[in-house]
Amino acid sequence: MAKELVVYFSVYGTAKIVAEEIAKQTGADIAEIEPVVPYDSNRDHYNALARLAKKEHDEDQRPLIKNEIDIAAYDRIYIGYPMWWYTFPMILYTFFDKYDFSGKIIIPFNTHMGSGDGGTYDTIRKLEPKATVLTGLPVEMLDAENGPAKAVEKWLKSLH
């Protein structure tokens, strides 16, 4: 049986909610991508976070990751993130640059406020051509906050 890991990056906690649900339903291990410099998780400061995210994207920054994640020990890796400026946060580029996904199965999921996956699943396929990238799960932010169990269950069944 394939060893599974759910890896996620989340500032406001919505991607974390989905990640925890996936781990619960699959029995996968779970790990958070933690930035060296934490992002402000106060939703009242959303505009400041949005400006920072845009600046990172425009300047092609690669925020550093604080923790190590043992990707090599896993065959199937669920990777989750919020959408920022219609793409994934730049720390995900750091993550894909840092680890070798050759021969792995990547299963993306994301939270959003109306942009779906924004083409990020195709971006992952381009960044990781030696991995197999399966159909992802875009979850609208309010659906994540209200409980994604049914959507996750349906999606997981579609993968098998």
Predicted regions and their residues:
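N-terminal beta1-alpha1-beta2 submodule of the flavodoxin-like/Rossmannoid cofactor-binding fold
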Residues: 1-79, 86-88, 93, 97, ...
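Extracytoplasmic/periplasmic soluble domains downstream of a signal peptide or transmembrane helix
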Residues: 3-4, 31, 119-121, 134
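Short, conserved loop/helix-junction motifs that constitute active-site signature segments
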Residues: 71-72, 97-103, 126-129
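Glycine-rich, charge-decorated loop segments at or immediately adjacent to ligand/cofactor-binding or catalytic sites
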Residues: 114-127
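Residue-level recognition of beta-strand->loop/alpha-helix junctions
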Residues: 32-34, 110, 137-138
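Glycine-rich phosphate/pyrophosphate-binding loop and the adjoining helix
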Residues: 132-160
